[in-house]
């Protein structure tokens, strides 16, 4: 009995040290990736199990699934025995082959058994490097991610509590299905403001992309001045976007002036549970020195 008491005493004494050790471990950067920026997309290097060649993935927080270039899959002899549906901005679903990457290496760390949807990523042909895939949520679920725009590096910490050295002001994060969501407020030319929820999209080629039901509800197509229009090829068809400017966007303690915004009648990336106004993209996030995303703890840190 005496030995049991001694053992319990030792465990109680060691618990704070063990807890501290866990915190210290989580504070350690497990990988540092130097990224390139192409056409508002962040490109990070990676390797896979059966190849020594460096692959290049677009990192996009809005990517609920990981896509992989069909040409790269053929080169790596990545087999596919299943089909699954995926959709674009216009919500048209197409069936594509799927496969699994046994180990995806990111510098000195890795993600095991990454399910990938095989697609021809022809829209990135102008990139300085071949785009081999697009990854988002699979990376966010595995690591706490810091995007350092000032030095163009991405730092990865093991998933867990946000490391104490992370800089910036905290904002709560929510999820719409698997996509990160934040609260934000826009101003209108008449001085009125509208607060709502927005998808947090690191790779968006825009400042704000409004969902059409939100545009209709608040008459943004008449209240906001029209700059011009663009035609963009989506997965299945060409979409027409109307471009405008929002006087300012406020997110927590931060405010960004003169934000370019767009909308299209074909865009409605909304939630079935609560209203989502749209998405906030790269033009806004590049205004910050760094951004840290703790997907599992539902936290976002913005450093100006």
Cite the ranges covered by each PLM segment.
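Pepsin/retropepsin-fold aspartyl endopeptidases
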Residues: 20-304
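Bacterial Sec-dependent N-terminal signal peptides
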Residues: 1-27
